[in-house]
Curated annotation (Swiss-Prot):
The keyword Hydrolase does not apply. It comes from Thunnus obesus. Component of the cytochrome c oxidase, the last enzyme in the mitochondrial electron transport chain which drives oxidative phosphorylation. The respiratory chain contains 3 multisubunit complexes succinate dehydrogenase (complex II, CII), ubiquinol-cytochrome c oxidoreductase (cytochrome b-c1 complex, complex III, CIII) and cytochrome c oxidase (complex IV, CIV), that cooperate to transfer electrons derived from NADH and succinate to molecular oxygen, creating an electrochemical gradient over the inner membrane that drives transmembrane transport and the ATP synthase. Belongs to the cytochrome c oxidase subunit 5A family. One of its GO terms (cellular component) is mitochondrial inner membrane. InterPro entries: Cyt_c_oxidase_su5A/6_sf (IPR036545). This is Cytochrome c oxidase subunit 5A-2, mitochondrial. It is a peripheral membrane protein.
Amino acid sequence: SHGKQETDEEFDARWVTYFNKSDI
């Protein structure tokens, strides 16, 4: 068991990358 902070940070980072990659 890790924590919600780690998942939240990873999720945020992935979301940012996704937006940056799919920035039309």
